[in-house]
A protein has these predicted regions:
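Acidic-basic catalytic patches of nuclease active cores, encompassing PD-(D/E)XK
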Residues: 1-24, 67, 82
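Histidine- and/or cysteine-centered catalytic micro-motif in compact active-site loops
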Residues: 23-24, 42-44, 77
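Beta-rich nucleic-acid/ligand-interaction surfaces
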Residues: 25-29
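Active-site-adjacent loop/helix micro-motif of nuclease/hydrolase catalytic cores
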Residues: 45-58
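Basic, amphipathic alpha-helical patches used to engage nucleic acids or provide basic targeting signals
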Residues: 55-68
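Nucleic-acid nuclease catalytic cores
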Residues: 65-91
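Intrinsically disordered, low-complexity terminal regions enriched in charged/polar residues
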Residues: 83-131
């Protein structure tokens, strides 16, 4: 499932007032005023028991959501379903540096060190059993 499909699924099934961000490189993907959510979307081709989040994305979500008085959410799709993570202080994320591609689906395949953490599926809410 591509991020555009994930957005449409969420809009159709969960958040009818979901609005996409306007910029390609915004620090978020969408918002819902009805549910007071500031959301980053991620589509994964492979299912894992933990889902990666970059520290820089996490920090941007926390700061920008707080400035807008919205709750920061990180929503992931995998081949086995959709998981939503409300990024609250009680979710402890161990951070580590990993050598990863600069981007996921673009022509630039070079790698850099990135600070990342892994969210256990149990810390999120499963929105659908399979998509």
């Amino acid at each position: 499932m591509k991020e555009a499909d994930l957005f449409q699924y969420l809009k159709d099934s969960h958040y009818p007032d979901l609005v996409k961000s306007e910029g390609t490189y915004d620090t978020f993907d969408c918002t819902t005023e009805q549910f007071k959510m500031y959301i980053e979307l991620k589509s994964r081709r492979t299912h894992y028991p933990t889902l990666l989040i970059e520290k820089s994305k996490y920090d941007n979500l926390i700061l920008a959501a707080g400035a807008r008085q919205l709750a920061p959410w990180y929503i992931n799709s995998t081949p086995e379903g959709v998981w939503a993570f409300h990024l609250t202080p009680d979710i402890e994320i161990p951070w580590s540096t990993q050598y990863l591609p600069v981007t996921t689906d673009f022509a630039n395949k070079s790698k850099i060190d990135k600070m990342v953490g892994f969210l256990p599926l149990e810390a999120g809410v499963q929105l659908d059993a399979s998509v």
